[in-house]
Structures are given as C-alpha cells and as structure tokens.
Amino acid sequence: MPTIQTKHTLAPQTELYYETYGEGRPVVLIHGWPLSGRMWEGQIDALRHAGYQVISYDRRGFGQSGKTATGYTYDVFASDLKDLIEALKLNDVTVVGFSMGGGEVSRYAGLFGMQYLRSAALISSVAPYLLKTEGNPDGGMAEADVEGMVQQVAANRPQFLAGFTKKFLNWDENGSKLGDEFLDFTASLYFQASPVATQECVRAFAMTDFRADLAKLTVPLLVVHGDADQIVPLEASGQRVPQYQPNAELHVMKGAPHGLNATHAEEFNKLLLDFVAR
C-alpha cells in the first residue's frame, strides 16, 4: 500500500495513503469531507488520459491514511500536503482542492507561499471563511450551526450522513442519472473516516479564516462553484474569493450542487483540463 510518512512536528506523525496514475506534469487532488481520494475517480481518468501524473491522497483521519487522535487543523493539513509533495519529489504542481480541501490549498499558500506550485483550483470550496461573525457577516454558518452539526455527527453518524449525501448531490434532481449505487459508494467512503476526524474537521472547515491565505495564493487560480450548492452556498464562499484574491477566475456552474464533479462531470472535467493545460 503506497504511503508517505509525515515529517513535520505540528501533530503526531502518521502515514498518508496516496495513489498515483499516469506520467507528465503533476496534479494533486485533495478530497472533501468526509470522503477520501476515491471521490476523484472521474477526474483521475480524464487527467491521466490527457497526459498528466495524477496524485490523489487521503487526508489524515480519512480513507486509508493514519487515524491520529489529534491534529485536525489546517496548519497540520497544509504541512501534511507539503510533506507529500516533498516525499514524492514533485514540482510545478497544480493543486486541486474540493470543499474542505480548498482549505488545504489556501493554508498551504499562507504557510509556504508558492513553493512547488504552478497553479491551483478551488472546487466547491469552503474558502474564504464560512463562519458568520461580526467581522464576517457574509459567512454561511453561525457558531451554533457548527456545533449542532458536530453533535448530530456524534449522536448518529450514519443517519446524519445519509441526509447529507442527498443534499451534497441534490439527489432529487440528479439521483436518476447517478443511480442508488452511487449513494452506496459514497457511504463506503464516509465510513473509512474516523469518528474523531469526522467531528473535528467540521470545526476546522467551518471556523478557519482563509482570507489572508488567499491573498498569498498568487499562482493562476481557478474557482468552480455550483449555484445550487446546498452544503457550501456560492454566495458565502466561491463568489467571495475574488475579493481576497483578485487574480481568481470564477466559474459558476448553473444548476450544479456541491458534488458537481460527480453530477456534472463532463462540464467540470472540461473546465479543469482547460485550466491545467495553461
């Protein structure tokens, strides 16, 4: 099983599971909550056939990576990403972060600048800052909402995630083309995650401020968001990114939900491939 050992000392060291396909310029795919690198199946195929080396990995606490008791913060996640890039000796990298994975991309810029990077993409991302505060009135979640979500996950994770998945995919509109089997596949990824990581990452993605990080994300930046996203609404996230990084190129996908890489794969893959080719 291919893994790398984290080296930084911000959290307990652990193994990160990764998969790599194809040859060419590297593209690193960072998954969302509470999934794993397997969420990118449709994109891995498109990218490897287009002549890129594609690396997907599981965040600590998720998929087949190590399940640490602590360390579920974005400083740790971004440092894990840097350790992966260095262990695999990657350079000229395009990093693509989905949902909470957009936080890794943003915080990486804040901590390490543009080291090793060629370009970046934020897909249905939690950036710039989801928490609604006096200084961030356009945030999408009040603190009580965040803690309520954590409590629901802790009380009955399977029940909560069953409902979450249908909102993630806007199932009433998209279920017929994906099929019930896709729900089973998604659930199988959820339950590879540790309960602790599943809970703690809600606080991490909802309560971490990425606004200053985005200002340092100066490589070409693609932002893709669906205007029917029920999980991370466009108005609270993707639409706001250009305020903090004017070089961001925002593409709003009409009628697309949070999980647009699955429901609108053909449209999304074209956007991604066109961007990566630059």
Task: Please report, for each region that a protein language model flagged, where it lies by residue.
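Catalytic active-site module of serine/aspartate enzymes centered on a nucleophile-bearing elbow/loop
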Residues: 246-278
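Conserved alpha/beta-hydrolase "nucleophile elbow" surrounding the catalytic nucleophile
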Residues: 31-33, 93, 97-102
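Conserved alpha/beta-hydrolase "acid-adjacent" motif
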Residues: 230-236
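Flexible "cap/lid" loop of the alpha/beta hydrolase fold
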Residues: 106-111, 115-155
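Conserved alpha/beta-hydrolase catalytic His-Asp/Glu region
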Residues: 128-140, 151-215
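Short beta-strand/loop motif that positions the catalytic acidic residue
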Residues: 217, 223-225, 229
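Conserved acidic catalytic loop of the alpha/beta-hydrolase fold
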Residues: 76-93
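Conserved HGGG/HGGXW glycine-rich cap/lid loop of the alpha/beta-hydrolase fold
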Residues: 10-70
